[in-house]
């Protein structure tokens, strides 16, 4: 029994001598290269579906992450809008309650004015008791006004000012030869503002233009 020969050498048989070994070696290298290429191609073919699947999963996850981010940003924006709306509503409710309370206080302040205006100068001169009482009421009225001013309730300076429909309510008009037409010459009821906003316009008499 002769020596074992590889399959590539078997057709040559006993003629595989040193003279034809280079040719045989070249053939072996070609077969080996072809076999490697075939194996690589088979591996790539087997890997392609898996790579494609992973790429698809990655794309899906990326889209899902983008959607979640968009939803989160929208939720944050909605929450901030809700906070702002709530803050404005609370402020409006607070301002409305404070405005109603302020108007009620103004009625008390008006009563001080009515009481002081009901006493004539002659009565003050005739009776020291009435004069003392009048001074006490005036002092109380002044303290009350200072307290209101400390909390943002301020009187409107109307007398002698040009008529402003945002600040004044004209109750009558009269010609006044020594005054400028369109200005306030009489304050029937003082007006007030709360933190710069008019809560009660001043009721005033306005100088009428005689040529109008």
Curated annotation (Swiss-Prot):
PROSITE patterns attached to this UniProt entry: GRPE (PS01071)
InterPro entries, per database record: GrpE, GrpE_coiled_coil, GrpE_head
Pfam family, one: GrpE
Subcellular compartments: Mitochondrion matrix
Keywords: Chaperone, Mitochondrion, Transit peptide
Keyword Mitochondrion: yes
Main location: mitochondrion
Any one annotated GO CC term: PAM complex, Tim23 associated import motor
Gene Ontology biological-process annotations: protein import into mitochondrial matrix; protein refolding
GO MF annotation, one: protein-folding chaperone binding
PANTHER family: GRPE PROTEIN (PTHR21237), GRPE PROTEIN HOMOLOG, MITOCHONDRIAL (PTHR21237:SF23)
Role according to the record: Essential component of the PAM complex, a complex required for the translocation of transit peptide-containing proteins from the inner membrane into the mitochondrial matrix in an ATP-dependent manner. Seems to control the nucleotide-dependent binding of SSC1 to substrate proteins.
Similarity field: Belongs to the GrpE family.
Subunit relationships: Component of the PAM complex, at least composed of mtHsp70, MGE1, TIM44, PAM16, PAM17 and PAM18.
Protein name: GrpE protein homolog, mitochondrial
């Amino acid at each position: 029994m002769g020596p074992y020969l590889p399959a590539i050498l078997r057709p040559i048989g006993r003629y595989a001598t040193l003279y034809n070994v280079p040719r045989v070696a070249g053939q072996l290298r070609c077969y080996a290269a072809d076999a490697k290429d075939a194996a690589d191609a088979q591996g790539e073919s087997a890997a392609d579906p898996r790579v494609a699947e992973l790429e698809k999963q990655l794309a899906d996850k990326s889209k899902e992450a983008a959607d979640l981010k968009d939803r989160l940003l929208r939720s944050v924006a909605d929450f901030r809008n809700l906070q702002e709306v709530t803050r404005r509503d609370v402020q409006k409710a607070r301002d409305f309650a404070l405005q109603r309370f302020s108007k009620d206080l103004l009625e008390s302040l008006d009563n001080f004015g009515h009481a002081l205006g009901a006493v004539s100068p002659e009565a003050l001169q005739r009776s020291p008791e009435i004069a003392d009482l009048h001074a006490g009421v005036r002092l109380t009225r002044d303290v009350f006004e200072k307290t209101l001013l400390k909390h943002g309730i301020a009187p409107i300076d109307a007398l002698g000012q040009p008529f402003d429909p945002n600040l004044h309510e004209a109750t009558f008009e009269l010609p006044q030869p020594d005054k400028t037409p369109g200005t306030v010459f009489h304050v029937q009821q003082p007006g007030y503002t709360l933190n710069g906003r008019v809560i009660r316009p001043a009721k005033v008499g306005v100088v009428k233009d005689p040529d109008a």
